[in-house]
């Protein structure tokens, strides 16, 4: 398929009175995330897949101020690379496409319905603690905490239990967001049941089968990361012996 030329003319794709429409949900999610400190200073982002369309928040804008008309829309499936090959069917001319786009696409290729990227301080801190305690190859692990029940065991495997050990892989940061894609996909292959990947000194990518699941899983993980930092201060182990 050739690239769509008049990307700015499909405004109907982001115009809806339905609060559950992706073009309305993404601004609402970003306002919510800003309140948590997850998308400060234009960082982070969110994307939703509906049928054969991908809706994505723009790059380099104040996330708490995003409006439906700021949303990019991609035809799906679409190539990750090169960026010029991506099939935009709506592209606000005054804004930049999200640098997270190929990483979001990696999650959608795994069957996700929504992918969230945050710059949570708690996520960053646990990546540093894991590096200090386990080295660069270590992953985040925690067990025997009630909130673990908010995380799936894997596709079609139900939710984790209180006595299960949650494992979240960590990848190294890169100078440019898009360059994280191959490492993210490698982590997805190594941990096929994961619904999240931490990025050291950067943040986290979380995805779910739909918007509600991605959001609640992101909330549960951030709770666990904050708890882990506080447990570390008290000398408490993350995984109960």
Curated annotation (Swiss-Prot):
Gene Ontology process terms (BP): L-methionine salvage from methylthioadenosine
Residues of the active site: 146 (proton donor/acceptor)
Domain of life: Eukaryota
SMART domains in the record: Aldolase_II (SM01007)
Localization per record: Cytoplasm
Family matches, as HAMAP family: Salvage_MtnB_euk
Signal peptide positions on this chain: none
Keyword Nucleotidyltransferase carried by entry: no
Known cofactor(s): Zn(2+)
Organism: Ajellomyces dermatitidis (strain ER-3 / ATCC MYA-2586)
An example Gene Ontology CC term for this record: cytoplasm
Name of the protein this chain belongs to: Methylthioribulose-1-phosphate dehydratase
Sites where the protein binds Zn(2+): 117, 119, 202
